Design a protein with these regions (language model features):
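A cross-taxa feature marking solvent-exposed loop/turn segments within ectodomains of secreted
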Residues: 33, 346, 359, 440-441
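Conserved structural scaffold segments of CAZyme catalytic domains across common CAZy folds
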Residues: 1-107, 113, 120, 280-282, ...
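Short amphipathic alpha-helical segments with coiled-coil-like heptad repeat character
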Residues: 11-15, 283-285, 374, 441-446
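Alpha-helix termination/capping residues and helix-transition junctions
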Residues: 29-32, 139-144, 360
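Active-site-proximal substrate-binding groove within the catalytic cores of carbohydrate-active enzymes
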Residues: 171-400
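Non-catalytic C-terminal accessory domains or segments of carbohydrate-active enzymes
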Residues: 370, 375-377, 383-447
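Solvent-exposed loop and beta-edge segments used for protein-protein assembly and interaction
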Residues: 77, 142-144, 189, 197, ...
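Aromatic- and carboxylate-enriched substrate-binding clefts and catalytic-loop regions
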Residues: 37-258, 265
Length: 447
């Protein structure tokens, strides 16, 4: 799934109107590029952090002010647009007492106000497992949602650890108990229902049920540039080996609005996410985005089907990150390289084609995607002058000595999404090909 999410874009201003306005905007401007999902995050029954929840609003009773027509109405409207409705859930706790808790007080393991709730269930309690959890999970489908984001996993494990001796079955570890809950949810929803775990504050929250979830949030909320560098980039380097091998690693929303980013920073965030083929979740109020930032979204959609080359945790230099994507097609193989300046000052970076990109010694055509500039035929290395927090994304293609493509404009992969056939006919001296493009989107072939 790729598309808009409420929390990062509008936070506690999320409501039916905001969701449907962004869904309609996404349908008109981004759906043809690959944005196919709308995520309703936790505001549907939460109104603030660290407070006792309002009476009458809980998992089974969405906020009637924010969603006056109910969640089924919202999901249906999203689906009418041809988009996938997705829902945030936190079924291991409740923000306020409700009928189930009042009738089954022994199902509550801890009553303690946390960011997401106050009543935390005993994961091993039979009534929780056999009554509350199935009812909560079934509601997702009853309301018409086709994907979910299961949050509150770290704090659930925290309280399960702290109050472990009071569990109905303390012989189970906290991870085993939570895994059983996830396993039951998966059985109810089926194998084809997309489930995203959230969030990965530590390794165990990502790994305890990696085989049961389809995707995993691998870090905390990312808004400003420092959070992007210290959490987003760092967590990707640590967990990328799992991406598209065991799970889809989700490093958090792509937030590019001017409130949190210069244009260079917005380009850098978009580039790093896209070149690595990570999930694209949009974290801005879409109608408010300036046109040049909407353009960034068009060039990173759809998410690439990329797999890691490394089987272990990666590292990077303190002043830069180089993300190297190899694209292999029947007609050509080339590299797309994101060079990210981590410094808030100018930075000269030299990329060694053999040492950094693992390319054979030879001549290569190098094209700068964002600056729309051909950097020439390169041997050995290429040196870049990067502005503070800026990125350059390069297409690096083996020099063939005949007319050939150096880049295309549709996608940051510079042919990975759009090029379907390419061939040079020596007899006629013609370069021929077939591209899949988006209607109304200007398309350039750079050769």
């Amino acid at each position: 799934p790729a598309g808009w999410m409420t929390w990062y874009a509008v936070k506690f201003d999320a409501c039916e109107k905001a969701v449907l306005e962004n869904a309609a905007w996404q349908k008109e401007h981004l759906a043809d590029f690959g944005a196919n999902t709308i995520w309703v995050d936790w505001e549907w029954y939460h109104s603030a952090f660290d407070i006792h929840g309002p009476e009458g609003i809980d998992y089974f009773h969405p906020d009637p002010v924010r969603y006056p027509h109910g969640l089924r109405y919202v999901a249906d409207k999203i689906r009418e647009l041809g988009l996938i409705p997705a829902l945030w859930i936190g079924p291991t706790n409740e923000p306020a007492s409700n009928q189930f808790i009042e009738e089954n007080p022994d199902t509550v393991l801890a009553k303690q106000v946390a960011w997401c709730g106050e009543y935390f269930f005993d994961l091993t309690n039979e009534k929780f497992l056999n009554e509350y959890l199935p009812a909560a999970v079934k509601k997702v489908k009853e309301w018409g949602f086709e994907a979910l984001k299961w949050d509150c996993l770290p704090v659930t494990l925290l309280f399960a650890d702290q109050y472990h001796e009071y569990m109905a079955h303390p012989e189970l570890t906290s991870e085993q108990a939570l895994r059983e809950a996830v396993k039951r949810a998966r059985a109810l929803l089926g194998e084809d229902f997309y489930m995203l775990s959230c969030a990965g504050a530590a390794d165990r929250e990502i790994l305890f049920a990696i085989d049961l979830f389809d995707g995993a949030r691998i870090g905390g909320d990312i808004f400003n540039w420092r959070e992007f560098i210290n959490d987003f980039v760092a967590r990707v380097m640590r967990f990328y080996a799992y991406h598209n091998t065991e799970t889809y690693c989700d490093p958090d929303n792509l937030v590019i609005r001017p409130e949190f980013n210069s244009l260079d920073q917005a380009v850098s965030r978009t580039s790093f996410l896209s070149v690595l083929g990570l999930p694209v979740t949009l974290g801005d109020n879409l109608p408010d985005l300036p046109p040049e930032r909407v353009e960034l979204l068009k060039r990173c959609l759809p998410a690439l089907d990329a797999h890691p080359m490394d089987i272990r945790e990666s590292h990077h230099e303190s002043d830069r990150v180089i993300a190297n994507l190899t694209i292999s097609r029947s007609f050509e193989q080339w590299n797309v390289v994101d060079v990210l300046n981590l410094l808030e000052q100018d930075n000269r970076v030299t990329v060694d084609l053999e040492a950094d990109l693992h390319l054979k010694k030879g001549r290569y055509l190098v094209y700068d995607f964002w600056n729309k500039e051909f950097l020439g035929v390169v041997e050995g290395s290429v040196t870049l002058e990067l502005r503070p927090c800026a990125s350059q994304v390069l297409a690096v293609r083996p020099y063939q000595g005949v007319p050939q493509i150096v880049s295309t404009s549709r996608h940051i992969s510079q042919g990975g999404v759009d090029l379907k056939e390419v061939a040079y006919e020596a007899k006629t001296r013609l370069l021929k090909g077939v591209s899949a493009v988006v209607a109304g989107d200007p398309y350039e072939i750079r050769a």
